């Protein structure tokens, strides 16, 4: 209806590639999720074609989708922890096995926390979530 506002929260491709530290363990799954996710620019085009005005995008880099558990590096080795993010379902069995092997190796050498911090650093710039809103014309 004219004047109505739609708000959509989603992850941009940049956020999917750089906003989640553990995604770096499953690079093929990142590409699969990007294929299934509408980037904000494409979303704006679709909304415009559907009769909406200019789409505005907002990112709050302080939002962490998994709250404090996101920063528990060894959580990646726990199936319950992994069930908190659907990207793991897109990892092929061999990719998951490789990822868990790498995470175990990093944990055993005391480097898992460092891996997490290194790969989490871009999140402060790109965030994890984009809020897109547009008004129906």
Which residues does each PLM region occupy?
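Helix-to-beta-strand junctions that scaffold the AdoMet/dcAdoMet cofactor pocket
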Residues: 1-2
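Conserved class I S-adenosyl-L-methionine
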Residues: 5-38, 64-69
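Short low-complexity stretches enriched in small and charged residues
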Residues: 9-14, 43, 86-94
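Short, flexible segments with low predicted structural confidence
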Residues: 15-19, 47-48, 74-75
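Active-site capping/gating segments
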Residues: 31-53
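Conserved Class I S-adenosyl-L-methionine
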Residues: 53-137
């Amino acid at each position: 209806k004219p004047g109505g506002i739609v708000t959509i929260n989603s992850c941009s491709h940049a956020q999917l590639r750089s906003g989640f530290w553990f995604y770096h363990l499953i690079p093929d799954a990142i590409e699969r999720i990007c294929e299934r996710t509408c980037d904000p620019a494409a979303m704006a085009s679709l909304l415009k074609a559907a009769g909406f005005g200019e789409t505005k995008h907002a990112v709050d880099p302080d939002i962490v989708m998994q709250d404090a558990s996101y920063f528990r590096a060894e959580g990646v080795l726990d199936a319950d922890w992994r069930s908190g993010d659907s990207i793991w379902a897109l990892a092929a069995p061999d990719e998951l096995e490789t990822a868990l092997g790498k995470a175990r190796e990093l944990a055993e050498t005391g480097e898992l926390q460092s891996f997490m911090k290194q790969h989490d650093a871009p999140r402060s710039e790109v965030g994890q979530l984009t809020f897109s809103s547009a008004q129906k014309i």
